[in-house]
Amino acid sequence: MQFIDQAKIEVEAGKGGDGIVAFRREKYVPTGGPSGGNGGRGGSVFFVADENLQTLLDFRYNHRFQAEKGTRGGPNNCTGAGGKDLIIEVPCGTTIYDAETGELLGDLTEPQQTLLIAQGGKGGLGNQHFLSNRNRAPEYALPGLPGEIKQLRLELKLLAEVGIIGLPNAGKSTLISSLSAARPKIADYPFTTLIPNLGVVRKPTGDGTVFADIPGLIAGASHGAGLGHDFLRHIERTRVLLHLIDATSDDVIRDYNTIKEELQAYGQGLAERPQILALNKIDAVDRETVDLEALATQLNHLSYAPVFIISAVTRTGLEPMLQEIWGILDQMKVPEEVEALR
């Protein structure tokens, strides 16, 4: 499954500080020469890849970024302070284009990979630089140069091998948070997740598996209800589906069938995709009144899929479930685009 997130922003490097006109005025140097210092260089703008970021969502609310200006020069040949560079963090996998020309400026694929995107302006020259035999007391200096301004288009492409599906509040965001370093928004109301959350889960071998928490589906999603087609499309290219079911529900079988019917109605082979079921939230279940093992057996008979009894909160049962997922993935051919992201 490939996610393409886009954002358009403007970045501006800092203007260089102005050079100044100044002359030496020491007590015993009555005819002191020029001593105006140069302006400081403006700050530059850099992009840095951060493995803890998952989307370009922040750029939808903040479209303009500007580095600090350099300060003006000082007397006694003092150069002004340089402007602070601006570091903009983006997720690994972000591609940066010039929005006006379409030129590819950079592709940040590795953690901490850095790209200079806009150069700060040079500081202006102070009048000390214009001293000559003809002009012993120059009374002019140069202003600092402007920093580069660029209109940019950012694109983020990520591929997920495992799609976590289920009704709203089944615990998908909590699970992906427990399994990986992702920290999705988590709250106890439907549709908390409005965009897919991505997390990389490491195998004991060190290889990473990309999991996607697909926003909650509801009855009628295949016809556009709720968050509808947008999120069913997100799971078309997943290789394995992890179907999370709330064990505290008053009708676990109904909940399972709701998602199953939506996958079948949508088509695209989703219902035939390799699937694992997980009864979640067992930490909140009264084991004296709810027979989890019987529910798991019933779900297994309905789905012909392995069923695990887990708690995303306490991490109970997660390891056997992961081993099953990795076993299925190991038996399948790895797409080239997924391999490239490992």
From Swiss-Prot:
PROSITE patterns: G_OBG, OBG. GO terms for cellular component: cytoplasm. Its main location: cytoplasm. InterPro entries: G_OBG, GTP-bd, GTP-bd_Obg/CgtA, GTP1_OBG_dom, GTP1_OBG_dom_sf, OBG_GTPase, P-loop_NTPase, Small_GTP-bd. Keywords: Cytoplasm, GTP-binding, Hydrolase, Magnesium, Metal-binding, Nucleotide-binding. Gene3D superfamilies: GTP1/OBG domain (2.70.210.12), P-loop containing nucleotide triphosphate hydrolases (3.40.50.300). Mg(2+) binds at S173, T193. One of its GO terms (molecular function) is GTP binding. GTP binds at residues 166-173, 191-195, 213-216, 280-283, 311-313. Residues 1-159 form the Obg domain. Its EC number is 3.6.5.-. It comes from the Bacteria. Pfam families: GTP1_OBG, MMR_HSR1. Its cofactor is Mg(2+). Residues 160-330 form the OBG-type G domain. It is found in: Cytoplasm. One of its GO terms (biological process) is ribosome biogenesis. An essential GTPase which binds GTP, GDP and possibly (p)ppGpp with moderate affinity, with high nucleotide exchange rates and a fairly low GTP hydrolysis rate. Plays a role in control of the cell cycle, stress response, ribosome biogenesis and in those bacteria that undergo differentiation, in morphogenesis control. Monomer. Belongs to the TRAFAC class OBG-HflX-like GTPase superfamily. OBG GTPase family. PANTHER family: DEVELOPMENTALLY REGULATED GTP-BINDING PROTEIN-RELATED (PTHR11702), MITOCHONDRIAL RIBOSOME-ASSOCIATED GTPASE 2 (PTHR11702:SF31). This is GTPase Obg.
